[in-house]
From Swiss-Prot:
Its main location: membrane. This is Uncharacterized protein HI_0939. It is a single-pass membrane protein. The lineage of its organism: Bacteria, Pseudomonadati, Pseudomonadota, Gammaproteobacteria, Pasteurellales. The chain crosses the membrane at residues 10-33. InterPro entries: Prepilin_Pept-dep_B_prd (IPR016419). Keywords: Membrane, Transmembrane, Transmembrane helix. The keyword Transmembrane applies. GO terms for cellular component: membrane. It is found in: Membrane.
């Protein structure tokens, strides 16, 4: 009868094999965690990028309209001159909130309802004896600023000017103090998710071309940040 000689692994070989297997498994696990972390970082960055781009396009779209005034053949007297900042019909004012970076607040107006007035006037006039007679003028006065690391938009139902304002008092809506007005501004983004570290409005060509710069980060992960800019042509300014 033939004897069959069986050979097995030694204890040392078994330990080496187990060590190599564990090392390989550890490497795979580390690689998987690293990939997952990178994917999570990428998704958060894309989320921030999408939100800031959406916000920038919103502001840019609004600014392109500034100074727009519809032609109304029935209107005998418009109140636009009460709000225009000079004889050229300037409809934009750039400043900043107290203690905020320069050019971080923009105030402007345009004829949103296309009636030829700022606000809702009567069919024939929205000004009488040098005073505003239109209603809801504040609904066509707009603004954006950065304050406490957040973009804020001007509340159109609150204003620093009286309803029957004169040229002097109507223009107060476009002064530096209007950038400070407490209670007249609301957050444009979720304050719990985003921080804005830069919002700036710079002239490329005075009265014709404006560059908006925007930079921000995620509040819970400040190392994830995004910066972008947009050039806005102001077609309605002389």
């Amino acid at each position: 009868m033939m004897k069959v000689l069986l050979k097995g692994q030694t204890l040392l070989a078994l330990m080496i094999s187990l060590s190599l297997s564990s090392l390989l498994l550890l490497s795979i696990s580390h690689f998987y965690v690293q990939i997952q972390t990178q994917n999570q970082h990428m998704l958060l960055h894309l989320k921030l990028q999408a939100e800031l781009q959406r916000t920038l396009q919103l502001i840019g779209k609004d600014l392109r309209r500034l100074g727009f005034r519809a032609l109304n053949a029935k209107l005998t007297e418009s109140n636009l001159s009460l709000f225009e900042l000079d004889e050229q019909g300037t409809a934009i004012f750039i400043s900043q909130e107290d203690n905020a970076p320069p050019n971080s607040c923009v105030l402007f107006f345009y004829d949103l309802n296309k009636n030829g007035c700022i606000g809702k006037g009567s069919p024939k006039t929205c000004m009488k004896k040098g005073k505003n007679t239109s209603k809801s003028s504040t609904e066509e006065l707009f603004g954006y600023k950065v304050s406490n690391k957040m973009i804020k938009t001007k509340l159109t139902y609150q204003s620093v000017i009286p309803t029957n304002c004169t040229a002097e008092t109507c223009k107060r809506a476009f002064q530096q103090t209007a950038c400070n007005a407490g209670g007249g501004w609301a957050d444009l983004l979720d304050n719990n998710e985003y921080e804005i570290t830069r919002l700036q409005f710079n002239w490329l060509i005075e009265g014709k071309g404006l560059e908006i710069k925007l930079k921000g980060n995620l509040k819970q992960t400040p190392n994830i940040s995004y910066e972008t800019s947009l050039v806005v042509v102001l077609w309605n300014q002389k």
